[in-house]
């Protein structure tokens, strides 16, 4: 599955939401992607449009223009039958550090994060 978006929106620690880390985007086709985690939880919430899933064991790889989210085969229903979601993005280079920090916060202890930025 693939989405194209102009920007990845990242919040590494939202004080107003009990320190929840959030990464989200809206595709050029109007689809919404949301990846969140509260610091005291052992799982990650992934929402695609209006379909939420609770997952662990995600692998996420970030490039300057691409984000790849890989799920276990048993969790492919979260991505409508696919085992990965590729998001092509045009996030400004100056904002990628915040995206990286957010992904580290989301995946720490629950998954794998690889930065190729």
Predicted features by range, described:
Residues 57, 61-77:
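A short, structured beta-strand/loop element
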Residues 2, 46-48, 76, 80, ...:
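Residue-level signal for well-ordered alpha-helical segments
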Residues 1-63:
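The feature represents the first ordered module of a protein
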Residues 28-29, 52, 75-77, 93-95:
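Residues that cap or initiate secondary-structure elements
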Residues 41-44, 54-55, 65, 87-91, ...:
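Short, low-complexity, polar/charged sequence segments that are solvent-exposed and flexible
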Residues 81-117:
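Mixed-charge, glycine-accented linear interaction segment located at domain edges/termini
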Residues 3-8, 44-46, 67, 85, ...:
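Hydrophobic transmembrane signal anchors and adjacent membrane-proximal interface regions, especially
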Residues 33-42, 78-92:
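Extended Gly/Ser/Thr-rich low-complexity repeat segments
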């Amino acid at each position: 599955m693939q989405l194209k978006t102009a920007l990845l929106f990242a919040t590494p620690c939202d004080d107003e939401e009990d320190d929840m880390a959030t990464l989200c985007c809206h595709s050029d086709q109007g689809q919404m992607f949301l990846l969140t985690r509260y610091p005291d939880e052992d799982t990650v919430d992934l929402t695609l449009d209006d379909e939420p899933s609770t997952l662990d064991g995600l692998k996420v790889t970030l490039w300057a223009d691409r984000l790849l989210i890989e799920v276990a085969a048993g969790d492919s229903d979260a991505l409508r039958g696919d085992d990965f979601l590729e998001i092509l993005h045009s996030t400004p280079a100056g904002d990628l550090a915040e995206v990286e920090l957010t992904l580290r916060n989301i995946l720490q202890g629950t998954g794998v994060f690889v930065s190729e930025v």
